[in-house]
């Protein structure tokens, strides 16, 4: 069977059960922490696929990766996945669950990169504008990237607006080099 198909089935089953028990938000938080753990700690994947690491140790690792206090449904789900020897699919399951949750709750991720730190009033104003435009709840993350020189880079779902000085200067340079 396909990795995506199996992962999707596990994620959909977990989402359905969490929704029935009205714990989908709590499981969402735990799955976000798990997904972040996989991206920040590449060794976690290796530890899960290592046959020398016992199942109870893997449970401890995944519980710690889920956050300080994980919900019972998350813990039971982790035990189920490990019992069926599907631990290598956990990163995919986490990402699919997060996607299902955001789709259900109409949450749009927005990434706002600037060359210098922006005050909270500007972020709040932008968040309100985007909420009105999209009709969705906005999950906002802002990052400072000095290499932009000035301006900003905004990513909303699959759309990207690059109004950075670095990009504008690169485009001017490319244009000048082509017209020699």
Curated annotation (Swiss-Prot):
List the gene name: atpH
Question: What InterPro entries is this protein classified in?
Answer: ATP_synth_OSCP/delta_N_sf (IPR026015), ATPase_OSCP/d_CS (IPR020781), ATPase_OSCP/dsu (IPR000711)
Stretches of the chain forming a coiled coil according to its record: none
What protein am I looking at? ATP synthase subunit delta
Upper taxonomic lineage: Bacteria, Pseudomonadati, Bacteroidota, Bacteroidia, Bacteroidales
- Give this protein's Gene Ontology molecular function annotations: proton-transporting ATP synthase activity, rotational mechanism
The protein's location, in the record's own words, is: Cell inner membrane
Q: What does this protein do?
A: F(1)F(0) ATP synthase produces ATP from ADP in the presence of a proton or sodium gradient. F-type ATPases consist of two structural domains, F(1) containing the extramembraneous catalytic core and F(0) containing the membrane proton channel, linked together by a central stalk and a peripheral stalk. During catalysis, ATP synthesis in the catalytic domain of F(1) is coupled via a rotary mechanism of the central stalk subunits to proton translocation.
Mind naming one GO cellular-component term on file for this protein? Answer: proton-transporting ATP synthase complex
Q: How does it sit in the membrane?
A: Peripheral membrane protein
The record, for Pfam families, names: OSCP
How would you summarize the oligomeric state and partners of this protein? F-type ATPases have 2 components, F(1) - the catalytic core - and F(0) - the membrane proton channel. F(1) has five subunits: alpha(3), beta(3), gamma(1), delta(1), epsilon(1). F(0) has three main subunits: a(1), b(2) and c(10-14). The alpha and beta chains form an alternating ring which encloses part of the gamma chain. F(1) is attached to F(0) by a central stalk formed by the gamma and epsilon chains, while a peripheral stalk is formed by the delta and b chains.
Q: Which family does it belong to?
A: Belongs to the ATPase delta chain family.
Q: Which organism is it from?
A: Parabacteroides distasonis (strain ATCC 8503 / DSM 20701 / CIP 104284 / JCM 5825 / NCTC 11152)
What main location does UniProt list?
Answer: membrane
Which superkingdom heads the taxonomic lineage of this protein's source? Answer: Bacteria
Alphabetized UniProt keyword annotations = ATP synthesis, Cell inner membrane, Cell membrane, CF(1), Hydrogen ion transport, Ion transport, Membrane, Transport
């Amino acid at each position: 069977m396909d990795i995506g198909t199996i992962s999707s089935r596990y994620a959909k089953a977990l989402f359905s059960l969490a929704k029935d028990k009205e714990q989908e938000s709590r499981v969402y938080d735990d799955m976000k922490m798990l997904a972040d753990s996989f991206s920040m700690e590449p060794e976690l994947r290796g530890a899960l696929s290592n046959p020398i690491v016992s199942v109870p140790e893997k449970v401890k690792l995944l519980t710690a990766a889920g956050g300080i206090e994980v919900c019972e449904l998350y813990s039971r789900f982790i035990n189920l996945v490990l019992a069926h020897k599907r631990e290598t699919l956990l990163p995919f399951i986490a990402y699919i669950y997060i996607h299902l949750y955001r789709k259900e709750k109409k949450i749009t991720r927005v990434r706002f990169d600037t060359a210098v730190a922006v005050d909270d009033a500007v972020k709040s104003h932008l968040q309100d504008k985007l909420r009105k435009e999209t009709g969705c709840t906005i999950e906002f993350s802002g990052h400072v990237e000095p290499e932009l020189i000035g301006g900003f880079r905004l990513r909303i779902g699959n759309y990207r607006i690059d109004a950075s000085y670095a990009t504008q200067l690169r485009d001017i340079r490319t244009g000048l080099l082509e017209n020699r």
